[in-house]
Amino acid sequence: MTGVKIVQVSEKDLPEFIAISRETFADTFGKDNSPEDMAKFLEKTINEDKLGGEIATPGSFFYFLKVDGEVAGYLKLDVDDAQNEEVDPNGLEIERIYLRKSFQHRGLGKQLFEFAEEKGREWSKSVLWLGVWEHNENAKNFYASRGLTRFSEHVFVLGDDRQTDFLLKKALV
């Protein structure tokens, strides 16, 4: 696919970053959760203060995937103290990886994932890990095809609903 670029997100990109974050999260999980829980989650976690703070956090890195100049998806990587769990002090967490619906099933998720692996190796990380909702079969299958295996789980709260995320990892050697 021509015209594909992965570029780092900065504070000037915040309005576009908020928009794609809300769109992709709602598209991915809206049908499986109540409108009330979804609205509460989006209001609390995908806003200017929260995402602006995340962009400024040391050890957190955001990237847009652009196709012919249009933002098609994004990726959030965490290292060191920015990781959400104490999985491995030398780990790389993929905290978020999302594509707009119109860009799915075109190999772009694979490109974002491979970019994350490259960053992990560039940063001399030994383990790549992430959390995935236990009911997100498409994502679980994708991660299995990329060599990740389940090692634990944690609770993810969406609105008032306590859900289970499986934690998956793979070695970066």
UniProtKB/Swiss-Prot annotation:
Q: Which PROSITE patterns match?
A: GNAT (PS51186)
Q: Name one Pfam family in it.
A: Acetyltransf_1
The beginning of the lineage is: Bacteria, Bacillati, Bacillota, Bacilli, Lactobacillales
Q: Is Acyltransferase set as a keyword in this record?
A: yes
Q: What protein is this chain from?
A: Uncharacterized N-acetyltransferase in pepI 3'region
Kindly indicate whether the keyword Transferase belongs to this entry. yes
Q: Where is the N-acetyltransferase domain?
A: 4-173
Gene Ontology molecular-function annotations: acyltransferase activity, transferring groups other than amino-acyl groups
Q: Which organism is it from?
A: Lactobacillus delbrueckii subsp. lactis
The UniProt annotation places acetyl-CoA binding at I97, Y98, L99, R106, G107, L108, G109, K110, N136, E137, N138
Q: Which UniProt keywords apply?
A: Acyltransferase, Transferase
**Domain of life from the UniProt record:** Bacteria
What are its E.C. numbers? 2.3.1.-
- List the cysteine pairs that form cystine: none
